[in-house]
């Protein structure tokens, strides 16, 4: 039996992006599908195009499958519906129409993925307008592994790993032709589990009140480096900063399972809430905010008695802390004896 497999989209015509990036992840899954199908004696052709525009991307994959005279076409995707979603959305498959061989493959694939991962089963849906389904000359199935923005889905996907998903898709195909899969069941993705644990170790000290752009520079003329969601926790860096409306920070990049490189965020109180862990005490008038931990430092600003701030660290007799100035949050040095930690 001849099967054509492709990963959806490419890095010039990218797919969905949420907590994970569709194009990055479907590349992992489709390769795992191919590996398991070959191990089970199927003749497999990788019909994933290289980087190109979306129309070329779709046509090249379908043309390769048709020229191969494949008996089955499978395209791997990840879905997206919302900007952010905490609950489960699930796994599903698409076919051109019901009642044919494609539906049998699609049903077995989605059932096997759901049973093997606990992802919600969305079943088989039809869409005769999708290019991959209406231009192929063999039974064709689009697999939507899970939703990129669903925290529940992504947590499950990360725990189970792309190798298991690929195995389960191959198992569903085998079941459709009354064949028992002979590949070994992959173990839980220990690497991704470790990365998720690292996410739990990522120390934060601020909350985005609204969705924020991670910026490559502290200005309104910037490159958007990703997405910080409303209510997402981030880390304001322990660096002196007197820039109006901006602070250096990092955030957790779910698609890469790691802390981001330093970026800039809007520091206005209307969009950002920095934690507090200390109180200004015993100050009669004002406590100077300084650029350096020295009595000779120029003054950046000031805080008053009983004001709250976030202390990053204390060195000798000075505390580096983020405080709320009139324009937004800033970070400066303060004389530590006038600051009481919680």
Swiss-Prot record:
GO terms for cellular component: outer membrane-bounded periplasmic space. Keywords: Plasmid. Residues 3-173 form the MurNAc-LAA domain. GO terms for biological process: peptidoglycan catabolic process. Transmembrane segments: none annotated. GO terms for molecular function: N-acetylmuramoyl-L-alanine amidase activity. It holds the Pfam family Amidase_3. CDD domains: MurNAc-LAA. To C.perfringens CPE1502. This is Uncharacterized 38.4 kDa protein. It comes from Clostridium perfringens. The lineage of its organism: Bacteria, Bacillati, Bacillota, Clostridia, Eubacteriales.
């Amino acid at each position: 039996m001849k099967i054509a497999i492709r990963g959806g989209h490419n890095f010039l015509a990218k797919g969905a992006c949420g907590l994970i990036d569709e194009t990055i992840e479907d590349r992992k899954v489709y390769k795992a599908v191919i590996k398991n199908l070959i191990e089970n004696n199927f003749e497999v052709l990788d019909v994933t195009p290289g980087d190109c525009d979306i129309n070329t991307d779709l046509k090249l994959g379908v043309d390769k499958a048709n020229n191969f005279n494949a008996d089955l076409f499978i395209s791997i995707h990840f879905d997206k519906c919302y900007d952010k979603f905490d609950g489960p959305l699930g796994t599903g498959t698409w076919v051109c129409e019901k009642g044919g061989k494609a539906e049998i493959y699609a049903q077995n694939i989605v059932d096997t993925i759901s049973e093997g991962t606990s992802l919600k089963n969305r079943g088989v849906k039809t869409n005769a307008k999708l290019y991959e389904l209406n231009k192929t000359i063999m039974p064709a199935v689009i697999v939507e592994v899970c939703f990129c923005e669903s925290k529940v889905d992504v947590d499950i996907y990360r725990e189970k790993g792309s190798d298991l998903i690929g195995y389960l898709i191959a198992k569903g195909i085998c079941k459709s032709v009354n064949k028992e899969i002979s590949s070994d069941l992959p173990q839980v993705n220990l690497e991704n589990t470790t990365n998720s644990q690292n996410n739990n170790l990522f120390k934060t000290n601020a909350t985005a009140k609204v969705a924020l752009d991670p910026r490559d520079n502290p200005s309104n003329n910037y490159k958007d480096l990703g997405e910080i969601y409303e209510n997402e926790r981030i880390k304001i860096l322990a660096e002196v900063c007197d820039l109006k409306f901006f602070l250096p920070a990092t955030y957790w990049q779910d698609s890469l399972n790691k802390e981001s490189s330093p970026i800039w965020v809007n520091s206005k109180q209307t969009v950002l809430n920095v934690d507090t862990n200390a109180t200004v005490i015993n100050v009669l008038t004002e406590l100077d905010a300084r650029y350096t931990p020295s009595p000779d430092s120029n003054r950046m600003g000031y805080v008053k008695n009983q004001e709250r701030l976030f202390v990053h660290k204390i060195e000798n007799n000075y505390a580096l802390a983020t405080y709320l100035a009139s324009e937004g949050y800033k970070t400066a040095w303060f004389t530590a004896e006038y600051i009481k930690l919680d």
